[in-house]
């Protein structure tokens, strides 16, 4: 390391001869030259950097944050990017320098250029590549003072034929690992957030803290609907985050599958249809819920809330247009989630996956289908059951050996779950029946979910707990 030196130069009137002055000055020059020859530069190590920016925005990037041995009195050199302009902010200490990048008008896609970090003498340098992805401006239109709009197309969530459900730029598809049963309706889910905003992690089993302006989009449909075996989209539900909280808006699709119209009165509707699945013809009188029915399940301490987008439900892979990726990581990469997640997340399993542990499948099924009501803040908060995934490691919270609150004819002395005997278990009866008075869940289904009945019955039959 270069040592600090102080040199003194005396003048003749201080008593030294001109020869002495020349000698001292020569000594100073020799000393400085000799000092530079003994200088050992640091081994500067730079690393590649990446960033994303919208066409109409400016990106600030700390390109030195992941570099090593950056000299405080060094220098930084930028090559000229092709699709934008780049500059370095003023600094006192080189480590404080930031890159500012502005895309050219109309430019999109990837822009790469090189930056170099050198010491003050230019003797030691290192360079790396900066890659900037320029994103087009999202076409989504959302004015919180004017929503809900009268028709779904006003939002521009989808490009091309809206029935194809091809998301516009910035509209990100997602799917919970374990999905809600809704009379065998299929679903497509999407999330959109305003530019520059993101959700925050709260806990594994709690809803992400979404920013104002975020929208959750959920479309319900059936394939192979008779008589023409076509896809029929029934409704698209929006959950919009306003300053005062979440807001529901339901859009009912027309018969031509060209547009969806706001359910202005919030009454909902019944849609009878037949569809073919696995070679079997099925009938459902599908219920588009009223606003009050939506609120029954989508509430927490009397406030409207989404159900599914929790880290425990999103910590799995999804097949995006550009490849398979973990959903939480995709949200982070998109800018929709801050990168502040714990290293381990208590994650549900896909209840339909027969390769998973049977008890985990049961707990995951109850979490997505029942926990929104059976929680401290839900519609059934007065009940003993607590069916969220993190609570059901205690099987009493599912109902094992628990007495029912409401008597049911024929089950007067039964437990909610009688270990080893599904047919004698009240909870199994509620899942099995389609009687509106007794079925569980109360809303969202009119048909029996045969696939869940099979593995839940197997789980109950294999329980060996002895009730008091």
Task: Briefly describe each language-model feature range.
Residues 33-70, 119-139:
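Extracellular interdomain linkers/hinges and stalk-like, low-complexity segments
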Residues 1-41, 467-468:
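Bacterial Sec-dependent N-terminal signal peptides
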Residues 104-108:
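Short, surface-exposed loop/turn segments at beta-strand-coil junctions that are enriched for proline
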Residues 58-102:
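Surface-exposed or secretory-pathway low-complexity segments enriched in glycine-proline
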Residues 32, 207, 225-468:
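Sequence context surrounding c-type heme c attachment/ligation sites in exported
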Residues 109-121:
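A short beta-strand micro-motif common to beta-rich folds, especially ectodomain repeats
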Residues 138-202, 210, 221-223, 232-263, ...:
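Conserved small-residue
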